[in-house]
Amino acid sequence: MSKIGFNPIKIKSFSKIKTYDDTLPSLKYVVLEPAGFPIRVSSENVKVSTDDPILFNIYARDQWIGEIVKEGDYLFDNSILPDYAFKVISTYPKEGGMITSETVFKLQTPKKVLRTQFKKAKFSEIIGQEEAKKKCRIIMKYLENPKLFGEWAPKNVLFYGPPGTGKTLMARALATETNSSFILVKAPELIGEHVGDASKMIRELYQRASESAPCIVFIDELDAIGLSREYQSLRGDVSEVVNALLTELDGIKENEGVVTIAATNNPAMLDPAIRSRFEEEIEFKLPNDEERLKIMELYAKKMPLPVKANLKEFVEKTKGFSGRDIKEKFLKPALHRAILEDRDYVSKEDLEWALKKILGNRREAPQHLYL
């Protein structure tokens, strides 16, 4: 009886196989996973998938019949993608054997772990927005127990309000608090260069979300593709991406445990066909006096240098500022100034300087920026 010999990498082709060893076990089942090229010669990103499992089986058998493999080995494509490697994930029999004309192949696309690919957040980091938090509780309940809701699930939710008011932060907090996956997409990225690109991207987006459920799909800058037809000159030809997105929002596929949250600054400018797909609209407001003080105090504690100033004096002066404005445009420049001047604290003068930089000589905060 012949002994089976295994090699970690297989490169031989069918034409080289003259005889078969009848004593070798025949493989009934082989699961493959795309592994990539052994040498990367360009920046092109190749993604391998199959639309028809039957065709893939015919193709695979024709290439690899007679190959002897076990779990962990590699098979190399010799036709469409020369030298592209497929890793053998599992076989039956488990100890391995020879690929025959009866071997069944399955192409398994590796699932990407999305849970760690976003910055974690907590509700305690969100100052204010109490009404928004209340409305988001139903999303939390659904992500924690999708089967409880069935067809009554909160599937599509629209966050709207001025920039920097915590829409993305709220979505990240929802994902963190419920241990859900989180996929962030900028709407302009969904516009493809060629016909069919957009619909393919959106289809793959929701396939990833479904595989990673529970999952939040967060579509930022929705108005970039969802403007009303009244603004055709601004929106351009986005019919393909809009139609593909509407198909997903309509729930043609069940996608249990997947919630779509879209964000916009201008809900009134959205196409009614898109806006009507969102069963819930949640408003995010600019912080009031008390909330602005809490935001300043929260970020001041996180700064690498202590703030030696009475932050209450800046509450009225920052009226109309969002939480992001307070951090990025007010506190951060003040901190940088203190560091550049080799001081070990942020002074009132630093804060006044940063404020003057934002407002110039105007007395009123730039509320018009958020309309």
Curated annotation (Swiss-Prot):
Residues that bind ATP: G161, P162, P163, G164, T165, G166, K167, T168
Keyword field contains ATP-binding: yes
SMART domains: AAA
Keywords: ATP-binding, Nucleotide-binding, Proteasome
Pfam families named among the record's database cross-references: AAA (PF00004), AAA_lid_PRS2_C (PF23902), PRS2_N (PF23900)
A single BP term in Gene Ontology: proteasome-mediated ubiquitin-dependent protein catabolic process
UniProt xrefs under InterPro entries: AAA+_ATPase, ATPase_AAA_core, ATPase_AAA_CS, P-loop_NTPase
Source domain of life: Archaea
SUPFAM superfamilies according to UniProt: P-loop containing nucleoside triphosphate hydrolases
GO molecular function term, any single one: proteasome-activating activity
UniProt GO cellular component terms: proteasome regulatory particle, base subcomplex
Function according to Swiss-Prot or TrEMBL: The 26S proteasome is involved in the ATP-dependent degradation of ubiquitinated proteins. The regulatory (or ATPase) complex confers ATP dependency and substrate specificity to the 26S complex.
Family designation: Belongs to the AAA ATPase family.
Protein name per its UniProtKB record: Putative 26S proteasome regulatory subunit homolog MJ1494
Originating organism: Methanocaldococcus jannaschii (strain ATCC 43067 / DSM 2661 / JAL-1 / JCM 10045 / NBRC 100440)
